[in-house]
């Protein structure tokens, strides 16, 4: 029988002394753990170091040591031992940034860039206050100010255009007010508003084909029918406001007020764009360089994100028509290259417009880039929506949320957080694809760099390589910045496993 005393073990010799443990800190430990942890890793590390030793010295010598930093023309870069011709970049730097934008008006581009940075910087800092006001500034105020600064404002907006918009708003508000009304008086006001707005629209349309003289109103000379249309539109606004404000149906009244305010705000924006601020007009064909690159990229990014969300929701919709239209649009746009979309928008679209009607070439490019990027963004967002478990939808239904409340408060925040890498990847791809607008004659940064290669004052064997390196560095700075900020945002929002 074995007892506890029999299991006692007493060592009769000393334990051999072990080697000291490997250090867990310092550069030596890091090298051993990461670069020389095995024979294979050691061989790969040595080969990598050899490659860097082989490639880096020539690059440094070409870009810095033997580079030409100053000069008046191509003669400075024709020496056989000369490296990069940075004198060419220095001489053409302003053109690379602004294109052919007038020199005396380039302060407007600088001011626009400053206003953009002022709006983006607080938005990019998580702890910065007044986020809602900042978003309102970037979405509403900044685009209007930037458009006026870059173009000069004073757009030729016909009175008829404003009247048509006012009439549309009055018709919408009047109809909703009538539907929301429960008594006779609001109903009458709701009927009169569309009637007055319809009369204003007819008067404005008739002015296209008749010339009945002019009339002076408040010191301004208007065509007679324009003045009549404006007066009828004013009556329609008053009657529409009376109808929606007196309607006892609260939900309908709120919707009508929202539409009425939105149309009134749109008319105000048109009035601001039509105002003369004393700025000389600058046509978009004079834009170029980094200005065009940033305009196309920012408009494409801002426009493609909401478009992609709408298309993704439409493709997952239970309504057959909505799902079919969204699917056809996404698959059609994804099936053609961006060059084809830009070519169609620039060359083919004007052929289908009525005689005398045309769009600015840059505007057509912006629309094409936005639609193209929106189709790809839709698939990225749809991937995030499919990753949300069904229990999230059921939980939202259990607390009584509607479909749009569920999407806005529960589903979309989680889905967008999941696909942050895919979203930023689409943004980076869009930023690099802006160089394709050169196909339709718009000179972005890369296009203006290539265009200056033909300048006889700077034509040399070193000029093209230097220009491409400069353009590549600019693209890399913006793309790398977006990539790093997306990683920071992804880590900041990664709260799934925190306690």
Report the location of each language-model feature.
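Transmembrane alpha-helices and adjacent helix-loop boundaries
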Residues: 2-499
């Amino acid at each position: 029988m074995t007892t506890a005393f029999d299991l006692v073990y007493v060592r009769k010799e000393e334990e051999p002394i072990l080697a000291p443990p490997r250090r867990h800190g310092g550069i030596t430990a890091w090298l051993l753990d990461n670069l020389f942890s095995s024979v294979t890793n050691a061989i790969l590390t040595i080969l990598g170091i050899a490659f860097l030793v082989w490639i880096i010295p020539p690059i440094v010598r070409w870009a810095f040591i033997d580079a030409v930093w100053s000069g008046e023309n191509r003669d400075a870069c024709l020496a056989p031992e000369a490296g990069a011709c940075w004198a060419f970049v220095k001489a053409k730097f302003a053109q690379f940034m602004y294109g052919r934008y007038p020199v005396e008006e380039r302060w407007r581009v600088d001011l626009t860039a400053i206003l953009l940075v002022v709006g983006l910087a607080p938005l990019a800092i998580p702890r910065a206050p007044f986020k809602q006001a900042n978003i309102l500034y970037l979405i509403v105020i900044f685009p209007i100010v930037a458009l006026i600064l870059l173009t000069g404002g004073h757009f030729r907006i016909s009175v008829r255009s404003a009247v048509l918009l006012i009439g549309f708003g009055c018709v919408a508000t009047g109809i909703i007010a009538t539907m929301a009304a429960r008594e006779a008086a609001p109903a009458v006001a709701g009927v009169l508003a569309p009637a007055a707005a319809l009369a204003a629209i007819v008067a404005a349309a008739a002015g296209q084909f008749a010339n009945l003289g002019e009339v002076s109103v408040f010191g301004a000379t208007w065509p007679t029918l324009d003045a009549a249309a404006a007066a009828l539109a004013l009556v329609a606004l008053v009657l529409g406001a009376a109808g929606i404000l007196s309607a006892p149906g609260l939900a309908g009244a709120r919707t009508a007020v929202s539409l009425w305010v939105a149309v009134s705000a749109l008319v105000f924006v048109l009035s601001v764009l039509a105002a003369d601020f004393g700025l000389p007009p600058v046509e978009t064909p004079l834009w170029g360089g980094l200005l065009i690159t940033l305009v196309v990229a920012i408009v494409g990014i801002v426009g493609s994100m909401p478009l992609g969300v709408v298309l993704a929701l439409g493709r997952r919709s239970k309504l057959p028509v909505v799902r079919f239209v969204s699917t056809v649009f996404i698959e059609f746009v994804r099936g053609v290259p961006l060059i084809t979309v830009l070519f169609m928008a620039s060359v083919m679209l004007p052929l289908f417009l009525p005689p005398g009607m045309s769009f600015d070439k840059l505007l057509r490019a912006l629309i094409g880039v936005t639609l193209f990027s929106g189709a790809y963004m839709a698939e990225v967002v749809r991937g995030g929506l499919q990753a949300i478990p069904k229990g999230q939808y059921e939980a939202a239904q259990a607390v009584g949320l509607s479909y749009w409340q569920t999407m806005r408060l529960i589903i979309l925040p989680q889905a967008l957080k999941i696909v942050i890498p895919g979203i930023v990847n689409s943004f980076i791809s869009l930023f690099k694809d802006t160089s394709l607008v050169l196909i339709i004659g718009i000179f972005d940064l890369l296009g203006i760099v290539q265009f200056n290669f033909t300048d006889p004052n700077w034509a040399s064997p070193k000029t093209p390589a230097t220009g491409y390196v400069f353009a590549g560095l600019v693209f890399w700075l913006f793309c790398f910045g977006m990539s790093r900020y997306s990683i920071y945002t992804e880590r900041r929002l990664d709260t799934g496993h925190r306690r």
